[in-house]
């Protein structure tokens, strides 16, 4: 879990737009966040396996 202070800091509007960065909406992780879902890869995988994300299915080829 991310530190609450860093999550709070990321939610504030930055002084300059380039300083903004994405964080996972579920756990607050700053790396490998999918913009479309707003989730990190770990949370995305957990929620997809649980069937909590409509339209997401495991691919096979």
UniProtKB/Swiss-Prot annotation:
Matching InterPro entries, A to Z?
Answer: Ribosomal_uS14 (IPR001209), Ribosomal_uS14_bact (IPR023053), Ribosomal_uS14_CS (IPR018271), Ribosomal_uS14_sf (IPR043140)
GO biological-process terms attached to the record: translation
Q: Name one GO cellular component term.
A: cytoplasm
Keyword Amino-acid biosynthesis attributed: no
What PANTHER family does the entry give?
30S RIBOSOMAL PROTEIN S14, SMALL RIBOSOMAL SUBUNIT PROTEIN US14M
The entry's family comment says: Belongs to the universal ribosomal protein uS14 family. Zinc-binding uS14 subfamily.
This one is known as: Small ribosomal subunit protein uS14B
Q: Which organism is it from?
A: Mycolicibacterium smegmatis (strain ATCC 700084 / mc(2)155) (Mycobacterium smegmatis)
């Amino acid at each position: 879990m991310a530190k609450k202070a860093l999550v709070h800091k990321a939610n504030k509007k930055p002084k300059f737009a380039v300083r903004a960065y994405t964080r996972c909406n579920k756990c607050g992780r700053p790396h490998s966040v999918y913009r479309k879902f707003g989730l990190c890869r770990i949370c995305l995988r957990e929620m997809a396996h649980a069937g909590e994300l409509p339209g997401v299915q495991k691919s096979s080829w």
